[in-house]
Amino acid sequence: MSFCASFIGTGNMGSALAAAVSRADQNIGLFDLDAKKAQTLAKSIGATVTTTEEAAKSRFLFLAVKPNVIIKVAKSLSGILADNTVIVTMAAGVKLEEICAAAGTNRCIRIMPNTPAAVGEGMILYCVASEVTKDDEADFLNLLKGAGVVDKIDEKLIDAAAALTGCGPAYVYMFAQALSDGAVSCGVPRDKAAIYAAQTILGSAKMLKNSDKHPEKLNI
């Protein structure tokens, strides 16, 4: 079977992106050493559990594995990739040139996504290797149109930017908890406080995004 996109690794980030790609109504393959994880995700998003050999023939092959094993995984793909396959790597701190050298191809895209991609509101940063064509890039952007905002950035800046986008959600959740805890301490039911906090953050973020003002100017 030929897949438009396949994912090696179905952890938090791999699952979030696979869910986003599934919204583009694409044929998706999933592989994980933990077969039950792959099967559970496949059932929930309408994907197919596959092998690494089949995944290597996909148009886009997402390597959603930890940084400490990604080079090993990339090396295992050398020589079995299809001519039009583009590798998409998301391992923090691992440069494009390292992935390209290990996999034996310069058709690689490096991305730094965040988990809100699972609900179509992610912030995905990306940069491309030398042999990624304009058509490849256009197909890649179309594939991730259901993930949120996708922005191209120089690789030398991607780690710094990803510190904001990748860690940011955790800070927002902590802030939301603090807001709701404060309301609960004043007698507001927990379920209502959680909704109020989430909507307040959502509305404020939308105002900030739609405004050309500095955040300080909105703090009135």
Short names for language-model regions:
Residues 1-50, 60, 121-122, 184-186:
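NAD(P)+-binding Rossmann beta1-loop-alpha1 motif at the extreme N-terminus of oxidoreductases
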Residues 5, 108, 158-163, 218:
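Short pre-catalytic strand/loop immediately N-terminal to key active-site residues, enriched for Gly-Thr
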Residues 17, 53-126, 130:
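Rossmann-like NAD(P)(H) cofactor-binding subdomain of soluble oxidoreductases
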Residues 38, 70, 189-197, 218:
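Small-residue helix-packing motif on alpha-helices
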Residues 48-53, 151:
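Short acidic-hydrophobic, aromatic-tinged amphipathic segments that line or gate anion-handling sites
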Residues 98-107, 123-161, 172-211:
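Internal alpha-helical scaffold of NAD(P)-dependent oxidoreductase catalytic cores
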Residues 213-220:
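Short, intrinsically disordered, charge-balanced linker/junction segments flanking boundaries
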